[in-house]
Amino acid sequence: VQTCALPICLAEPMLLMSVLDNLYSNAVHYGTESGTIYIRSNNNGSRVFIDVANTGSPIPDDEKTMIFEPFFQGSHQRKGAVKGSGLGLSIARDCIRRMQGELNIVSDERADVCFRIELPLEPEKSMK
């Protein structure tokens, strides 16, 4: 485990934990048994980045554009895994956007799948 000092991110703690829990659960659910899950954070002085990534089961390119759509379910589930509702990533993105952030799938040379949460260090405006 590596740690580094990060500035405090002004976000709704329970909402952020819910999103992180969803992303971690998806990494377990869609990854392979021999895969690895990474959770990393960094900042660029104005924004905080939190990556939840896993190895072992890449998302097909044609599904990456639809992955945040409500009710969309990926085709790459682990054999025998219980199917979800297809709402988790859509709700997670909405939650992050309520905190003036973004949730996207990004490329990462160390992982097959990487979801990145990007949040401002200072809120642009108060949550509605």
Provide a role label for each language-model segment.
Residues I59-F71:
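Short conserved segment of the HATPase_c
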